[in-house]
Amino acid sequence: MTVKIYGSGGSGTVALPSSKSFTQRYILGSVFLNKSVTLNYVTITGDDSIALDIAQRAGANITMNDSSIKIRTSFTCPSDIYVGESATSYRIALGLLGSAGCITHVKGDPDLAKRPMDPLVKALEANDVHLKLNEDGFYDVDGSESKKRYIEVDGVSSQFVSSMIFYYARKGGGEFLVKNMRSPGYVYITKRVLYDLGYFVNIEKTITINPSGVWKTAIDVEPDYSSLAFFLVLGLLSENVDVRFNIKRMSRIQPDSVLLDMFKDNIAIDRDTLRVLPGIRDRITVDADHNPDLCPPISVIGIFSEHGVEIDNYARLKTKESNRYEGIIDMASRFGAIVEDNGKDLFIKRGDLKDPGTLSYTDHRMIMSAAVAAAASGFEVEIENETKVSKSFPGFFKELSKFANVSESN
C-alpha cells in the first residue's frame, strides 16, 4: 500500500510501541528456560509475532489480553520453526535450540538468510552443536551432542553474544570469552532480561552466567527508544508540531536512549512527560557500530540542517534488514542533500531542497525515516510499502497523522 504525506502541523503525545528487543528476549527466554511469565504493556510487532510462534511450537501456551501476554511453559523441542525476517529471533533461537539438545528445521524470509551468521555458527559448533545449511539458506540445528565449553565468541554482532548467553543459561550456567564486542548496549538488554528470568550475567571480557533461582512472574516491558527517534526528529525539524512522549516506564538500558544525551538542549522533561523543542544548532554525530537503528532517522536531520549529520562506521549499516547505507544516501540525495563519503564515515548536509516524488524502500526504518522527511519537507510525497513498518512500529502512520497530513494514495 502507498500513503501520501503532505506538510506538518499539530500536537499530541506519541503512543510508542514496546521495545521488541526486550519482548523477543523475554518470550524466547521464558519458554526455553521454562519460566512462566506475564508480559505487560506489550505492542505485538511483526518480530514479536515470530517469537510467539516459536514459543508455541516449543510447547508454550500463549494467552493475549489487550496489552498483556501470558506465557505458560511446558517445553518441548520443536521439529521446525519459522523466523521470518527477524534476526533477533533467529540468532537467539539457534543458541537456545542447540543448548536444549533439539533437532530442528529452520525456515525464514530469503532476505534474512543473506545476513552474516559465521561467528555464531563457529561458537555453537565449538560446543558440538551440529549446524547444516539447508536449501532455504538457514541453519538446521542438531543439539543432541551439545556441550558446555569455555570458548571464544566474535562480538561483531551483539546478537551473537546474546545468543551464547542464552545458550549457557539453558545449560545451567557457564562462561565464555568475547572479542571485538560491538553494540554492547544490546548485550545489557539480554543481561536485564535474564536477571528478570532468574540468572546473574556478569559482562566483562569473559561473560559469566549463573542461575539465581528467583525470577519475576510479571514483567512490564518498556517502550522503544528507536521508535521515539522518528518523532523526536520531526519535532526538532518542524516548528509547526508539538511532540510529546510519556516516559514513565523508560529506563536507560536501551542503547538508543543516548538520544536523551544527544538532544538534551531540545528536550524538556516534566515528571513523566518529555517534550521536544525545535531547532538544530550543531552538527549531529551518530556511531553506526553502537546505534545502527538510529542512523536512518538521524540522517533525516542532515537533509534540512546547515550543520549536517555525521554517521561514523557506516559499514555496520550494510548488513541490517537492508543495505541502509545505500538507502540513506538515496533518500538524502532525492531531497537534494549534499552527501560526502570518506570510505568510513558519511556526511549529510542541506543542499537545494527538492521534491523527491515517490519514495520506495522495503526496510521498516527507511520507510519511517522517509515519511518523517516528507512531513518536514512540505512537499506532497508518496511513500510505498507502508505496511512493512509493522515489523517494529505497527501504529506509526496513525501516530504520524497527529502531526502531518497522511492519506492513502490511489
Curated annotation (Swiss-Prot):
The record's subcellular location field reads: Cytoplasm
Matching entries from Pfam families are given as: EPSP_synthase (PF00275)
Q: Which GO terms describe its biological process?
A: amino acid biosynthetic process; aromatic amino acid family biosynthetic process; chorismate biosynthetic process
Gene encoding the protein:
aroA
Could you tell me one molecular function GO term of this UniProt entry? 3-phosphoshikimate 1-carboxyvinyltransferase activity
Annotated EC = 2.5.1.19
Q: In which pathway does it act?
A: Metabolic intermediate biosynthesis; chorismate biosynthesis
The similarity comment for this entry is: Belongs to the EPSP synthase family.
Annotated function: Catalyzes the transfer of the enolpyruvyl moiety of phosphoenolpyruvate (PEP) to the 5-hydroxyl of shikimate-3-phosphate (S3P) to produce enolpyruvyl shikimate-3-phosphate and inorganic phosphate.
The name under which this protein is listed is: 3-phosphoshikimate 1-carboxyvinyltransferase
Residues bound to phosphoenolpyruvate are K20, R115, Q159, R324, R365, K391
The positions annotated for binding 3-phosphoshikimate are K20, S21, R25, S157, S158, Q159, S183, D293, K320
Q: Which organism is it from?
A: Thermoplasma acidophilum (strain ATCC 25905 / DSM 1728 / JCM 9062 / NBRC 15155 / AMRC-C165)
HAMAP family per UniProt: EPSP_synth
Q: Which reaction does it catalyse?
A: 3-phosphoshikimate + phosphoenolpyruvate = 5-O-(1-carboxyvinyl)-3-phosphoshikimate + phosphate
Lineage per the UniProt record: Archaea, Methanobacteriati, Thermoplasmatota, Thermoplasmata, Thermoplasmatales
Which InterPro entries does the annotation name?
A: Enolpyruvate_Tfrase_dom, Enolpyruvate_Tfrase_sf, EPSP_synthase, EPSP_synthase_CS, RNA3'P_cycl/enolpyr_Trfase_a/b
Query: What EC class does the entry list?
Result: transferase
Top-level division of the source organism's lineage: Archaea
PANTHER family in the cross-refs: AROM/DEHYDROQUINATE SYNTHASE (PTHR21090), PENTAFUNCTIONAL AROM POLYPEPTIDE (PTHR21090:SF5)
> Which GO cellular component terms, listed alphabetically, does the Swiss-Prot or TrEMBL entry include?
cytoplasm
